[in-house]
Swiss-Prot record:
Biased composition annotated in UniProt, kind: Low complexity: 418-430, 441-478
Domain of life: Eukaryota
Organism: Dictyostelium discoideum
Protein name: Putative uncharacterized protein DDB_G0287113
A single Gene Ontology CC term: cytoskeleton
Region (Disordered): 1-27, 413-478, 658-727
Record's compositionally biased regions (Basic residues): 1-21
InterPro entries: TPR-like_helical_dom_sf
Biased composition (Polar residues): 431-440
Residue ranges with Acidic residues bias: 665-707
Length: 766
């Protein structure tokens, strides 16, 4: 089924009035009285206190008893509600449209629907604003978000726990308040998933599980939602929110059996939970409705949609409408009786104590059912009513309960008078089982006695009543309802490889359990092969890296040798050039010494130029040598870095291999231990099974032997007594008896006309 989710807008107060909180907790009367005593300004001060953010500037002003909301200077003047005795005030709210919608819903609820509902919405908004205040306090500095990636790790356990505690409480009161999305929500979800398995946050796990389950419910991620609901119920079985969320999912998936079971168990914890009541009514309609019964399908969807929207103004009309259609059009008295009981159940809830339409619809439905010969005992059978009254009923329903008792007494007296006035008509008041299809159990529904047919009805009173019609014209339970209430069947929750599976017992679903286990074993084998291939691949990569390192070392050595040879050759050439220059200088000096001819100025200039050129060449050579040395140093540094990186990679791969090997060894040891334990248990069970029949056989043999011995002893005793009677005279017998012990037990035996006393001779005979 698809649920149409309503979106509240600030510029349409009528729609905002319909979108109220979805989940109601039991608030005590003291909390409501305290909220009534508070001034509205004080409530708003506590709501938006100490919160600053520069993302959205939202100013709320009250001008001439009207509310003026200004979002980011758009000047959206909205007349929402008129108040008295309110002064002007301005607030800077760090939120998007959702907080304004929640605030407006709170004001509307406070004005129109009284303080109880406003208190619930107010609690949800207050907890949500407290969460945002803590978030701003921890992660916002000067209006800008701290971009540190490890910002969550800097917080203490109590700080994160307090944040999620307020967030979970806000969701349980009014989940529309935190229906925001974006990077913040993704961070919160990832953080909540990580700390949900951490024992340090055990104190806050309940609200964290509620928050995660509700988020996954909104995102339609049913497997994740059900997982957190199951784990939440495992550790916190008294939290009705987990039952409500699971019922919501199962109703959406059209799994009516599990949904009905969740509703029933949740209502045992909190019988006034409206969400569970609505879902249960929708499940009953949907389960009873066949494919050829479109009206019931429409009604089921109608109840479900109204449950989702929580349009409380339409609730009584929905139940009255369903009850009337079930009688007039569908002719299903059982369904009408069930709906009547739910109307009574809703009337007892504190939120509907003064609903005139609900009372009117219930009374008219009651009159119609009674006119169709449905007895008052059927309507008020306590065995079928699945309502568990609270320990302390609300104060404003006590008077109505007294009035109801008086009406019950008056109605019973009227029925007795009618029975006395009509003695000929026989009506049997049997308890109607809503789950049975037997026509004989519901004879009352077929007793439509007219004034002219009293004799026929009296003649048929001794036997089971026959059907008065067929199809929709018959009021019999077997003819009128092809639709059965699917009773709650137990379901089995099994944990297979850290995954929760839910199966219906006594059905074909249990066969899936073995198939799932086989598939998981296949997956484990595949994983083992996969990891083995990965290890081989890693080993090959390591060998390749080692070869690369060896080749690099060899190439470096060769390069160094070549460089050394080149340097030696350059030095030899330079030395040769220097020697040639010295020889030239010596020859020139010798010639100048022998001759006194003064060289012309041109030759001197040439010599000076040659010397300058030689000096420049030497400087250039020195610079080249320095540059080459620098390049060599850089290359050596780069090569060393590469070697370090490769060595680090090798170390990491080796560590990974070691860790995987250790994990494998641990897993193999655990598997071996588990297999040994299982084998030992199987052997013990077999031994016990084998020993039991052996023990039984031995006991039976011992009993048979004892019986045979007793028979033989009795026979021997009788024979010995007869022999003594034949052989010994009476005097000898009397003397023999006098000599025996008097304390021994005596027996009387009649032998013809004589009676003989004797004691047990078994010991002596043996």
């Amino acid at each position: 089924m698809v649920m149409k989710k309503s979106k509240s807008k600030t510029n349409k107060p009528n729609k905002a009035n319909k979108n109220k909180n979805k989940n109601y907790n039991n608030n005590t009367s003291e909390d409501v009285e305290q909220l009534d005593q508070l001034d509205i300004n004080e409530q708003l001060d506590s709501l938006f206190e100490n919160i600053n953010n520069n993302n959205n500037n939202i100013n709320i002003n009250i001008i001439n008893n009207n509310i003026d909301i200004d979002i980011n200077n758009n000047k959206n003047y909205i007349k929402i509600i008129e108040f008295k005795d309110l002064k002007k005030f301005n607030y800077l709210i760090p939120s998007d449209q959702t907080s304004i919608c929640g605030f407006v819903k709170y004001l509307i609820a406070l004005k129109n629907n009284g303080s109880r509902e406003a208190a619930i919405i107010f609690e949800g908004i207050k907890n949500f604003e407290r969460f945002k205040e803590l978030y701003v306090k921890y992660f916002f500095i000067g209006g800008k978000e701290n971009k540190n990636k490890n910002k969550w790790s800097k917080l203490r356990v109590d700080q994160i726990g307090e944040m999620f505690n307020h967030l979970g409480l806000a969701l349980t009161c009014c989940d529309e308040v935190i229906s925001f999305k974006g990077s913040l929500m993704s961070e919160l979800i990832s953080l909540a998933c990580t700390i949900s398995n951490n024992s340090l946050y055990k104190k806050y796990h309940e609200q964290i599980f509620v928050f995660l389950a509700s988020y996954f419910k909104q995102e339609r991620k049913n497997q994740e939602c059900e997982l957190y609901c199951i784990t939440g119920l495992k550790y916190f079985p008294n939290n009705d929110n987990f039952h409500y969320i699971r019922a919501f999912i199962h109703f959406d998936q059209i799994t009516s059996k599990q949904c009905y079971a969740d509703c029933k168990s949740g209502l045992k914890i909190n019988p006034n939970h409206l969400g569970l009541l609505f879902i249960k009514a929708g499940v009953l309609l949907d389960c009873r409705a066949s494919t050829a019964d479109p009206i019931s399908q429409v009604l089921a969807h109608y109840v479900y949609i109204n449950k989702a929207h929580y349009d409380h103004q339409c609730v009584p009309e929905v139940f009255f409408y369903i009850g009337m259609l079930s009688i007039n059009e569908l002719d299903k008295f059982q369904l009408a009786i069930k709906i009547y009981r739910y109307a009574v159940q809703l009337e007892r809830v504190a939120i509907y104590p003064n609903s005139s339409r609900l009372r009117m619809g219930k009374n008219t439905l009651e009159q119609i059912l009674l006119s169709h010969k449905v007895t008052w005992e059927m309507l008020s059978d306590p065995e079928d009513i699945e309502y568990h009254s609270p320990e302390k009923p609300p104060a404003n329903t006590l008077l109505e309960n007294k009035d109801k008792k008086q009406l019950d007494e008056k109605h019973n007296n009227k029925i007795k008078e009618q029975q006395q006035q009509q003695p000929e008509t026989t009506t049997t008041t049997t308890n109607m089982d809503l789950n049975s299809n037997d026509c004989s159990n519901n004879e009352v529904l077929n007793n439509k006695n007219n004034s002219g047919s009293s004799s026929s009805s009296s003649s048929s009173s001794g036997s089971s009543s026959s059907c008065s019609g067929s199809g929709s014209s018959c009021s019999c339970s077997s003819c009128s309802s092809n639709i059965k209430i699917n009773d709650e069947k137990p379901y089995k929750i099994t944990l297979i490889e850290d995954i929760y599976f839910v199966f219906d017992e006594n059905s074909e679903d249990l066969k899936l359990e073995q198939k799932i286990k086989d598939k998981i074993q296949q997956i484990n084998r595949f994983q083992e092969k996969f990891y083995a291939n990965i290890r081989e691949f890693q080993k090959e990569e390591i060998n390749k890296l080692l070869l690369i390192l060896q080749n690099q070392k060899i190439s470096r050595q060769q390069e160094e040798q070549l460089k050394k040879r080149q340097q030696q050759q350059q030095q030899m050439e330079e030395q040769k050039l220097l020697l040639e220059q010295l020889q030239l200088i010596q020859t020139t000096t010798s010639t100048t010494a022998n001759t006194t001819i003064i060289p012309p100025p041109q030759q001197q200039q040439q010599q000076q130029q040659q010397q300058q050129q030689q000096q420049q060449q030497q400087q250039q050579q020195q610079q080249q040598q320095q540059e080459e040395e620098q390049q060599e140093e850089q290359q050596e540094g780069e090569q060393q870095l590469q070697e370090k990186q490769l060595q680090e990679q090798l170390q990491e791969l080796q560590k990974q291999l070691q860790e995987e090997q250790l994990q494998q060894e641990v897993e193999e040891q655990e598997e071996e231990e588990n297999e040994e334990k299982e084998k030992e248990e199987e052997v013990e069970e077999q031994e016990e099974e084998e020993e039991q029949p052996q023990q039984q056989e031995e006991e039976e043999e011992e009993e048979e032997e004892q019986q045979q011995q007793e028979k033989q002893e009795k026979q021997q005793a009788g024979q010995t007594i007869q022999e003594l009677l034949k052989e010994e005279p009476l005097q000898m017998q009397q003397q023999y008896l006098q000599e025996t012990n008097e304390n021994q037990q005596l027996y009387n035996i009649s032998c013809g006309d004589k009676t003989i006393t004797y004691y047990s001779l078994l010991d002596e005979i043996d």
